Regions:
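Conserved catalytic cores of soluble enzyme domains
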Residues: 1-93, 196, 204
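Short low-complexity stretches enriched in small and charged residues
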Residues: 21, 26-27, 115-124, 155-157
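Generic secondary-structure boundary/loop-capping signal
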Residues: 31-33, 38-39, 43, 52, ...
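Short acidic (Asp/Glu) and glycine-rich catalytic loops that position anionic groups and cofactors
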Residues: 38-39, 58-65, 104-113, 163-168, ...
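Short capping/connector residues at structural and topological boundaries
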Residues: 39-40, 46-47, 60, 117-121, ...
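Terminal amphipathic helices with adjacent charged low-complexity linkers/tails
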Residues: 73-130
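Non-catalytic terminal/interface segments that mediate subunit docking, oligomerization
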Residues: 121-204
Length: 204
């Protein structure tokens, strides 16, 4: 079954391990920290005075890939979990539900004709392409703060759940880094488990 976890306060030890092992994780920017050890232990062991936020706040863990997303508060964390689960089947024996699509089938986007510059050295907005091609407002990005040269997330195409993987030429020209490779591998494993097809956009 799909497992989604929210950190809503200070999380340490085994609960922290369960959180990072989830298929999707989110933490509250206002109240959450994920810690191996708290400030008192760090002060005794290392002689350094650090706050819980400095040791394990959202800025730390969305950047290092420990959690997928950060949300403003508890309510937004739970909203992110609901959205993630809306793309998922109940278990691996089932396919994700297909929802009614109210995106007009005749919709076109003239901006796509010239959104990719003729000058290959010039960056462009891959997010704009993704959002235009897929069902409107359906793209749910995962791990935006980590491995930023790669874009991963879930979306819908004609109501069907799809995985999205693209390289982002606004960061390191879309090149594959160690963090980007780890992020992409983890996302492909998620899609392999729950079977949504993957749509890939590649910038060379």
């Amino acid at each position: 079954v799909p497992v989604a976890t929210a950190a809503l306060g200070a999380v340490a030890g085994l609960p922290a391990g369960r959180l990072v092992a989830s298929h999707f994780s989110v933490m509250s920017k206002a109240t959450a920290q994920i810690l191996t050890a708290g400030p008192a232990v760090v002060a005794r062991a290392m002689g350094e005075q650090k706050t819980k936020e400095e040791l394990g706040g959202w800025k730390v863990h969305t950047k290092n890939g420990t959690v997928d997303n950060g949300a403003a508060d508890e309510a937004e964390c739970l909203a992110e979990i609901r959205r993630f689960l809306s793309f998922m089947p109940d278990n691996i024996e089932l396919l994700a539900p297909v929802i009614d699509c109210d995106d007009p089938v005749e919709r076109t986007d003239e901006a796509l004709l010239d959104i990719v510059p003729r000058d290959r050295r010039q960056a462009f907005d891959m997010h704009r392409i993704i959002q235009s091609v897929l069902d409107l407002t359906s793209f749910f990005e995962m791990g935006a703060g980590y491995g930023r040269s790669q874009i991963t997330g879930l979306a819908r195409l004609n109501g069907q759940t799809v995985g999205v993987w693209a390289n982002n030429c606004k960061f390191l020209d879309g090149s594959m880094t160690a963090d980007g490779a780890h992020k992409a591998r983890r996302f492909m494993e998620l899609c392999d488990t729950f079977s949504p097809p993957i749509i890939s956009w590649v910038v060379e």
